[in-house]
Amino acid sequence: MQQNTNVDPQEIAKFERMAETWWDLNGEFKPLHLLNPLRLNYIDQTAGGIFGKKVLDVGCGGGILSESMARIGAIVDGLDMGEEPLEVARLHALETGVSINYVKNTAEAHREDHREYYDVVTCMEMLEHVPDPQSVIQACCDMVKPGGFVFFSTINRNVRSFVETIIGAEYLLKMLPIGTHDHNKFIKPSELIDLVDNTELICKDALGITYNPLTGIFKYTSKVDVNYMIATQKVD
């Protein structure tokens, strides 16, 4: 059963239009392909390894993170509301021989039959694209087992993030299609932690990610002024 109350149709349509290029390493999702090894390593290391664990990837899109987690032995469900990205994800998994269960649904609706079901839940680059981030965070909390980990990543809201992610990445470097992001929907780390604190999740770690346009390389950084991830754990 789908609950569409926490879905922005314009956001869904935006990624539907880009779906065909999801696995083009030099296409519109090149930044995600470059960023993904850092995300995967952070998730795997912080969660104490995800091999053999049940993992839910909320807002999975075309499956970049989902596939990488499945490749290192996780049992992955990928969740998204975009039909085209999910079709791309299913086809790519079939072509590469990776077993992933992709589902078209919201986190809130998926929760109905999956309370405390997953060992790990990931919600990466997704919160800034929904009307109510708190609702998604609560659903993620409800679906992870006590003691399990939930990972979030998003973009800080300040002048630097506006310059780097919108003016730089969208207009100057053409790394992303113009209109991919809305600066007003970016979430400050303090705001995200406040949202997390409203649930049974506890923030265990925060880590920034920086991009060097000259080398084309993403790196970890202690600064969370633009892209950042947080690791949370459900109270046991």
UniProtKB/Swiss-Prot annotation:
It is an enzyme of class 2 (transferase). GO terms for molecular function: 2-polyprenyl-6-hydroxyphenol methylase activity; 3-demethylubiquinol 3-O-methyltransferase activity; methyltransferase activity; polyprenyldihydroxybenzoate methyltransferase activity. One of its GO terms (biological process) is methylation. Pathway: Cofactor biosynthesis; ubiquinone biosynthesis. The keyword Ribosomal protein does not apply. Its EC number is 2.1.1.222, 2.1.1.64. S-adenosyl-L-methionine binds at R39, G59, D80, M124. Pfam families: Methyltransf_23 (PF13489). Keywords: Methyltransferase, S-adenosyl-L-methionine, Transferase, Ubiquinone biosynthesis. It catalyses: a 3-demethylubiquinol + S-adenosyl-L-methionine = a ubiquinol + S-adenosyl-L-homocysteine + H(+); a 3-(all-trans-polyprenyl)benzene-1,2-diol + S-adenosyl-L-methionine = a 2-methoxy-6-(all-trans-polyprenyl)phenol + S-adenosyl-L-homocysteine + H(+). HAMAP family: UbiG (MF_00472). Belongs to the methyltransferase superfamily. UbiG/COQ3 family. O-methyltransferase that catalyzes the 2 O-methylation steps in the ubiquinone biosynthetic pathway. This is Ubiquinone biosynthesis O-methyltransferase. The gene is ubiG.
